[in-house]
């Protein structure tokens, strides 16, 4: 699943080609996504100039002169730029054609993504309850500590809760907990303020670095400029269950935690 760095990489890849451009038409080949693509999307968006491409959590917001397209990549979706009129392959569901001759093409084999229309995106039901962005001053270790009081759930699903902080998905939660030396199974309420301060620093560092490197290359992710990300080869824990820890050599353990695979080092993480 594309996580925050992948979505931000996509935003940075497509924004320069979209902002300031006028939409010539929208082609919806198959609108059966997680929520149906609006049947009148072509009417709503065609002829409008794209003002800004921004991101909130893992949602891309393509703001037009009137209204905003909210896009989510789901489990396997991607947005990339192609020449307008290029023949579509299977799973290439939507094209937003621009007067420049390019088209923003949405591909989603599993159909878990979304393309929705809103005149007030930040108050949309999918966005209004989201927590702070992790790379802003609104998120820090103090917030983690305060929100964790009384929480008996494990720390890993706690930091993956979008009401606590957005965009810390399975990959980056695993890596941040490894870097902070925290066992992902520990109860959130049992972790000290000092350790949460360290964890917040690592979340920010790892996400920022992943964005700089272009996200994490997994099976289905392609950046908005058509290039893959490069962070995967630098993972310390995620996907490395049964392999030696890169720090101490201890065999990494893989467990199920909150319905997700979680890998940790029994020596480095306490």
UniProtKB/Swiss-Prot annotation:
InterPro entries listed in its UniProt record: DNA_glyclase/AP_lyase_DNA-bd, DNA_glyclase_Znf_dom_DNA_BS, Formamido-pyr_DNA_Glyclase, FPG_cat, MutM-like_N-ter, Ribosomal_uS13-like_H2TH, Znf_DNA_glyclase/AP_lyase, Znf_FPG/IleRS
Required cofactor names: Zn(2+)
Record's keyword annotation contains Zinc: yes
Annotated GO biological process: base-excision repair
EC numbers on record: 3.2.2.23, 4.2.99.18
Binding-site residues for DNA, renumbered to this chain: 91, 110, 151
Keywords carried by this UniProt record: DNA damage, DNA repair, DNA-binding, Glycosidase, Hydrolase, Lyase, Metal-binding, Multifunctional enzyme, Zinc, Zinc-finger
Cofactor note: Binds 1 zinc ion per subunit.
Transmembrane portions of the chain: none
Catalytic activity: Hydrolysis of DNA containing ring-opened 7-methylguanine residues, releasing 2,6-diamino-4-hydroxy-5-(N-methyl)formamidopyrimidine; 2'-deoxyribonucleotide-(2'-deoxyribose 5'-phosphate)-2'-deoxyribonucleotide-DNA = a 3'-end 2'-deoxyribonucleotide-(2,3-dehydro-2,3-deoxyribose 5'-phosphate)-DNA + a 5'-end 5'-phospho-2'-deoxyribonucleoside-DNA + H(+)
A GO term, aspect molecular function: zinc ion binding
ZnF segments: FPG-type: 236-270
Pfam families hit by this protein: Fapy_DNA_glyco, H2TH, zf-FPG_IleRS
Catalytic residues of the enzyme: 2-3, 58, 260
Role noted for this protein: Involved in base excision repair of DNA damaged by oxidation or by mutagenic agents. Acts as a DNA glycosylase that recognizes and removes damaged bases. Has a preference for oxidized purines, such as 7,8-dihydro-8-oxoguanine (8-oxoG). Has AP (apurinic/apyrimidinic) lyase activity and introduces nicks in the DNA strand. Cleaves the DNA backbone by beta-delta elimination to generate a single-strand break at the site of the removed base with both 3'- and 5'-phosphates.
Similarity field: Belongs to the FPG family.
Subunit structure: Monomer.
Protein name, UniProt field: Formamidopyrimidine-DNA glycosylase
